[in-house]
Every structure is written in structure tokens, then in C-alpha cells.
A protein has these predicted regions:
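Extended surface/linker regions that mediate inter-domain or inter-protein docking
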Residues: 95-269, 329, 333, 351, ...
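Bacterial N-terminal signal peptides that target proteins for export
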Residues: 3-18
Length: 394
């Protein structure tokens, strides 16, 4: 894990949660205020936690301490601490802080921290094959390249890393793929997440890059299927396979849960990964099994009925993995997910999916917008997070 500490800090996310609780309490008591609220001259209520947020002050030495640990794995030097302390007013301290921040990004230590960050994000690494995907992501970050290359790069997607020098050596993945698509065709990813019907590979893509568990798509209105739950996906119910349209696994079952709520998305993605074997090598036939008795090989009809095409999302077709990569690169939710992961890492939070450490869109709105304006350059996204008020004010 990346070297981190967890200082107690108040964020805008916390404010929103507590404000919502306060509003709920007011509704239950007829709108009366408690001792936690004070009134303005015009009679409006001011929330205590909004006041506390407004009382935060810039502390660039405290921010530097955390940033140095995150970005280099070490504490700042005494000279760095004194440089900020002696800089003068807050504006001058900000300039010194940001200069140190940028200098950290040019060190071998930062490269090592990025390898650790992406290993944790991908939940894989520390062997020659399993390291290639996180090392490629780390290389893109250290070299301030675009996030889009993570899904669209056709060469150099299996680099190696020298932990001593912090240097990356480009190398192509050799797993039988004609046209690579970043980490989506990486042999380590395919081997590590091998499973029945390729669903673990699909889960990896969804959770690592969209920052949510399945179900991934929710319709504006649900549909009563006569079962225990409603159908909430925007996809037509019959757009995936089931016992009634040729599938050997009944994804149309509604007796306990509505399987199609998740599988309406999953089944449109899984066939794209189905021809990779358990070593991550691309073969000419489907290599994954079904969970049925005897573990027979899966067939296309087990995921989708005849005539149904693969896709990233409803209305976003993806005929192959390069097509999927292009679709993901163009998805603003994927970009927002990356900023959210950098945000949680900087502020010492847990994994956004595993621990439900969610980051509201409004909280990182300015950082996400800046990310798009730079062409999704990864190092610039990190700087935007580490210079935000929520990071440097205490």
C-alpha cells in the first residue's frame, strides 16, 4: 500500500452528509432549530458544519507533510518545512508549496508510489506478468500522458519498471492480439481475472474504471416483472440470453433477484473478453466456461440472443476491444472515476468501491473539468487534487 497517514479533516462531502441529516431532523421537528444552528439577521438558519468549513484555514506545511508522504513515501525535509514557514504570507507559501509538489513528481520515489497506487487500484501486481498493467498505468501518470491511452494504446502496453531508478522501459504485449487496446488486452489482466463466462474481467473493468459495482445502468423508471424485485435496467429485458431465448444460464430469472439488472450490462461486455485463455493468450475460440454441470464451454448464445451486439452501455456499441477502449475513453464517467480515485488517495480514504468511499460529483466538479481541459493528462489531475482547498485547508 502507498505510504499514508490519516489526519482528521473536514471535507465538503462530510458537510453535505451532516447538512442532510440536519435537514431531516428539522423536518421531523416541524422546522425548529436546535442549539447547533444559529440564525442570521434575516432569520435564516446557518448550519454549524457549514460554519466550521468556512473556518478552515490554509496550512501549507501540514499539506506538504501529507503530500510528501503520498507522492514520495517520505516526510518533507527540514529545509522544505522551513522554506514554507519562512515564505511570508499565505500567497507566498502557496507558491513554495506548489513548487515542492511539482518537484516530487520528478523523482524515482514518485514513480514507485504510482506503481503501488495502480497495483492497489487494479488489485494485481508483483509478478512479471501481473505487473505490466499497473506499470503501464504508472508510466502514463509519471510521463503526464492521457488517461485515454490506458484504453486505446496499441503499442508499449507491457512495459517494465526499474524501482531503483524509477525508469520505465516500453515493451509490447505478446499474447496474440492483432490490435491492442491498452490494459483491456493486457495478458496479465486476462489471466488474473479469468473466470466463468469472463464475468470477473467485466467486473474489473467496471469497478476499476467506472468506480461503481454492478448494476451499472439504471433506468429512469423501473418495470414490474412479477418477481421479488423490479427490473431497473434501461436495456430491453430480452436483449440478453435466458432460458426462454436460447441461453443455458437463465439470466431472465426473477424468483429471488432480477439477474438482468446487472447482467443486461455484463452480458453485452463479457463476449469481448471470452477468447482469452487462463494465461491471458488470445485464442480463436471461446475459452471460458459456463457454471452449468460439467462446466461446458460458453457459447455466444449464453450471453446474448442472435442478432444482439456487444456494447459498453446502451446506445454505445463496441464491436471489439479497441472499440470498447474508444467508448471508455470518451465516457466522462470514466474520467470522473479517475479523479475520484486520486481524490480518495490524497485524502486518505479507502477504495471507492470496496469501502463505499463515494465522492459526490459536485465535490470534484472543478478538478474533473480541468482534467478534461488538459486532454486527461494524469499528472495534471494529481496536481489539481493536491492544490484544492479541501486538501490544503484545515
Amino acid at each position: 500500500m502507498t505510504a499514508q497517514e490519516n489526519p482528521m479533516r473536514t471535507t465538503s462531502t462530510l458537510a453535505r452528509v451532516l447538512a442532510a441529516a440536519a435537514l431531516a431532523g428539522a423536518a421531523c421537528t416541524g422546522g425548529t432549530t436546535s442549539g447547533d444552528d444559529t440564525g442570521d439577521d434575516d432569520g435564516t438558519t446557518v448550519d454549524e458544519w457549514d460554519q466550521k468549513l468556512a473556518e478552515r484555514e490554509y496550512d501549507y506545511n501540514a499539506a506538504l507533510r501529507i503530500a510528501s508522504l503520498r507522492l514520495t513515501g517520505r516526510l518533507p525535509t527540514l529545509a522544505e518545512v522551513k522554506a514554507i514557514a519562512d515564505a511570508g504570507d499565505v500567497a507566498a507559501q502557496k507558491v513554495v508549496y506548489e513548487s515542492f509538489l511539482r518537484s516530487y513528481l520528478d523523482t524515482p520515489e514518485f514513480a514507485n508510489q504510482m506503481v503501488r497506487f495502480w497495483r492497489d487500484t487494479f488489485k494485481m501486481g508483483e509478478s512479471a506478468m501481473l505487473d505490466t498493467a499497473p506499470v503501464f498505468a504508472a508510466q502514463l501518470t509519471v510521463e503526464n500522458r492521457s488517461l485515454t491511452e490506458l484504453f486505446t494504446a496499441t503499442t508499449g502496453t507491457c512495459p517494465t519498471f526499474n524501482a531503483t531508478t524509477g525508469e520505465f522501459t516500453a515493451a509490447d504485449c505478446a499474447n496474440g492480439v492483432t490490435t491492442h487496446a491498452g490494459v483491456l488486452t493486457n495478458p496479465g489482466v486476462q489471466a488474473h481475472f479469468f473466470s466463468n463466462m469472463a464475468f470477473r474481467r467485466v467486473r474489473f473493468v467496471q469497478e476499476a474504471f467506472a468506480c461503481t459495482a454492478f448494476p451499472a445502468e439504471i433506468a429512469d423508471a423501473s418495470v414490474d416483472m412479477g418477481g421479488a424485485q423490479a427490473y431497473t435496467s434501461p436495456w430491453p429485458f430480452q436483449s440478453i440470453a435466458g432460458a426462454d431465448n436460447g441461453g443455458t444460464v437463465d439470466f431472465h430469472d426473477t424468483s429471488a433477484v432480477v439477474c438482468a439488472n446487472c447482467h443486461s450490462t455484463m452480458n453485452h461486455l463479457a463476449p469481448l473478453f471470452a477468447n482469452f485463455d487462463d494465461q491471458g493468450q488470445l485464442q480463436t475460440t471461446i475459452q471460458v466456461k459456463t457454471p452449468n454441470d460439467g462446466a461446458p464451454d460458453a457459447q455466444m448464445s449464453d450471453w446474448l440472443p442472435a442478432g444482439e451486439a456487444t456494447a459498453w452501455r446502451l446506445g454505445v456499441p463496441a464491436a471489439d476491444l479497441p472499440g470498447l477502449g474508444q467508448a471508455m475513453a470518451a465516457d466522462p464517467k470514466v474520467a470522473e472515476c479517475t479523479v475520484a480515485r486520486f481524490w480518495n488517495w490524497a485524502l486518505g480514504k479507502g477504495d471507492i468501491v470496496d469501502t463505499l468511499s463515494l465522492v459526490p460529483t459536485a465535490t470534484i466538479e472543478s478538478q474533473t473539468a480541468a482534467f478534461a481541459q488538459t486532454g486527461y493528462t494524469l499528472q495534471d489531475a494529481i496536481i489539481a487534487v493536491y492544490t484544492s482547498d479541501d486538501f490544503v485547508k484545515f
